[in-house]
């Protein structure tokens, strides 16, 4: 990864031993290795995310081509891309649609009289406080 040879590694180790000492050197090595591991994980995560986004972009381009050509005379590759894109769109929309539907049903099920009763209770308690 860094293209470091054996003698360069030995030189870095000796300098680290002189600068940090034998007590702090193992802790410093562990810290550096954790940092490098975290950097590698972050780089892999970004790489995976970019490849996913590029795949989505490619699917969208194939869908545009399919719309322009007409749905009748598509190549098998484009047909599979269109189907895959439709499935992805349905899977994305489904959780939001289910949530919106359940919220709508909950809102319809709650009676409005509860709000009116609470307002009346507040008015009565305010009137009682004024009377005292």
From Swiss-Prot:
Chain ranges passing through the membrane: 1-21
Function: Part of the twin-arginine translocation (Tat) system that transports large folded proteins containing a characteristic twin-arginine motif in their signal peptide across membranes. Together with TatC, TatB is part of a receptor directly interacting with Tat signal peptides. TatB may form an oligomeric binding site that transiently accommodates folded Tat precursor proteins before their translocation.
GO terms for MF: protein transmembrane transporter activity
Organism of this sequence: Vibrio parahaemolyticus serotype O3:K6 (strain RIMD 2210633)
Entry keyword set: Cell inner membrane, Cell membrane, Membrane, Protein transport, Translocation, Transmembrane, Transmembrane helix, Transport
The encoding gene: tatB
InterPro entries: TatA/B/E, TatB
Compartmental location: Cell inner membrane
Assembly information from the UniProt record: The Tat system comprises two distinct complexes: a TatABC complex, containing multiple copies of TatA, TatB and TatC subunits, and a separate TatA complex, containing only TatA subunits. Substrates initially bind to the TatABC complex, which probably triggers association of the separate TatA complex to form the active translocon.
Any Pfam family: TatA_B_E
Predominant cellular place of this UniProt entry's protein: membrane
Lipid bilayer topology: Single-pass membrane protein
Compositionally biased spans, kind Basic and acidic residues: 96-108, 115-132
GO cellular component, one term: TAT protein transport complex
Gene3D superfamilies in alphabetical order: 1.20.5.3310
Family: Belongs to the TatB family.
Protein name as annotated: Sec-independent protein translocase protein TatB
